[in-house]
Regions:
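Bacterial N-terminal signal peptides
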Residues: 37-45
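Bacterial N-terminal signal peptides that target proteins for export
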Residues: 11, 17-37
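A structural boundary/capping signal
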Residues: 5-7, 14, 49-247
Length: 247
């Protein structure tokens, strides 16, 4: 895994520890409805909460502070949200063409919705487990960077960031509130590399969707993951004490 996680190397104004990184077809009507739901879910997921009064504290503990807007990670995250807005235009184009376009983005829309619709045959943890496993199987391990969900699904290659972004979008499309889906960069203390995961709040606990395993694990159980920063529609926050967990 050496050399695969370079994306935080240019960060400034962050603690030194934050600078070490590795990190089918279906009916036309159903497609119209499914794509519309996905457009709303993904775009809104990067912009606003579903319920303003239903926001749990951050995973891995709540001792976080906002990063300065000039910090490189913040700039990258804001750029990613701009890319998601471009994805919305591609979704609309697919709707107008009844998904008959040869555009690769329409193929990505179809792939994403197939994963989400299959996951919706389950509930709760089983739904999230299906999303995690399906995206892990879809994306091949390769060096990656922060980009929108459609590009990730189109290329089908990427690292932990690519998996996490795709899972973020898929969880939102599956109906989870923007307040209940976040991305977290962590330091794997056991293997000594930095990593990114998607986390989803369900039934009072944060569940980790990780490209390194198909199993869902609670944040409180993953003692070898020391949190570094958390990203969501509100912005980017870092943990005051990155290595907050005590052996």
């Amino acid at each position: 895994m050496n050399g695969e996680y370079r994306w935080l190397s240019s960060l400034n104004n962050l603690p030194a520890c934050l600078q070490r990184t590795r990190c089918a077809d279906w009916g036309v009507l159903n497609m119209h409805v499914a794509i519309f739901v996905t457009v709303v879910a993904i775009v809104v997921g990067f912009a606003a909460p579903t319920c303003a009064n239903d926001r749990p504290s951050d995973p891995f503990g709540n001792d976080t502070i906002e990063l300065n807007k000039e910090t490189a990670l913040v700039e990258m995250w804001e750029s990613l949200r701009d890319q998601v807005l471009l994805d919305r235009a591609h979704f609309r184009s697919c709707i107008e063409s009844n998904n008959q376009s040869n555009d690769t983005d329409c193929a990505a829309v179809s792939t994403l919705m197939k994963i989400v619709e299959e996951a919706r045959q389950n509930q709760g943890k089983a739904l999230l487990g299906h999303l995690n496993r399906s995206i892990n199987l879809l994306i091949n391990a390769a060096p990656g960077y922060l980009t929108g969900p459609l590009e990730v699904i189109t290329v089908r290659n990427g690292d932990c960031k690519s998996h996490s972004i795709a899972k973020y979008g898929a969880a939102r499309a599956a109906g989870f509130s923007a307040d209940h889906v976040r991305l977290v960069t962590v330091h794997d203390r056991r293997h000594n590399f930095d990593h990114m995961v998607a986390v989803v709040f369900y039934n009072g606990e944060w569940l980790i969707l990780d490209n390194l395993t198909n199993l869902l694990v609670r944040d409180t159980e993953k003692r070898d993951y020391a949190p570094l920063a958390v990203l969501d529609y509100k912005g980017v926050r870092r943990y005051r004490s990155p290595y907050w967990m005590i052996d």
